[in-house]
């Protein structure tokens, strides 16, 4: 997938979502409902590592969006029932269009009449790497190959999501249908972690 699909679905004169231009800067309309960029000092991410973000999206149907940085974009999966840290509870994850890297900072309200209309919160964020290496370049090479093969295993280092996870493409379904799986490790639990609210969710309005 490429960012062309992302751009074709959106009117950036009417949505605050980021449109990454050729210069790498967001070209969204700043006069509309604002997207909230988290202050760089509050980030848990580290330089030299791949980043991830999980959005909680109150669209026509509540769902979560897992976004993994790879090759200059955010590889994205919609998880209808939300993420899990229970190895017995595999969750459907539908692969959607790639999103621009700017989207990892996005938090705001997409106005009615636009694709994906509804409130978007950053639910969790952090860094991740391929299973077996923390090196960014080696991780990228491994993850790229694993996505192509339909089975990737990675380590998440977020505020909520920690430890080993896998994404596995379903062979007898749509090529967009994957399973999001928590591996059995010290961070596994039978609690429903998706019930935890996003940090900004209790605020009456986005800044």
Which ranges hold each PLM region?
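A charge-rich, low-complexity, intrinsically flexible signal that marks solvent-exposed coils, linkers
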Residues: 1-207
């Amino acid at each position: 997938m490429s960012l062309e699909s992302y751009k074709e679905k959106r009117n950036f004169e009417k949505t605050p979502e980021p449109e990454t231009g050729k210069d790498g800067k967001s070209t969204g309309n700043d006069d509309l409902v604002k997207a909230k960029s988290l202050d760089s000092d509050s980030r848990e991410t580290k330089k030299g590592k791949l980043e991830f973000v999980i959005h909680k999206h109150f669209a026509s149907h509540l769902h979560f969006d897992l976004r993994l940085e790879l090759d200059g974009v955010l590889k994205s999966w919609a998880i209808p029932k939300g993420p899990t840290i229970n190895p017995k509870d595999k969750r459907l994850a539908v692969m959607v269009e790639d999103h621009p890297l700017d989207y990892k900072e996005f938090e705001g309200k997409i106005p009615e009449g636009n694709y994906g209309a509804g409130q978007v919160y950053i639910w969790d964020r952090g860094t991740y790497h391929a299973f077996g290496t923390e090196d960014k370049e080696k991780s990228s090479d491994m993850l790229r190959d694993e996505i192509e093969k339909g089975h990737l295993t990675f380590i998440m280092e977020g505020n909520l999501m920690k430890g080993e996870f896998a994404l596995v493409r379903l062979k007898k379904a749509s090529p967009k249908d994957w399973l999001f799986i928590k591996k059995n490790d010290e961070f596994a639990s039978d609690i429903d972690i998706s019930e935890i609210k996003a940090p900004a969710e209790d605020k009456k309005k986005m800044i």
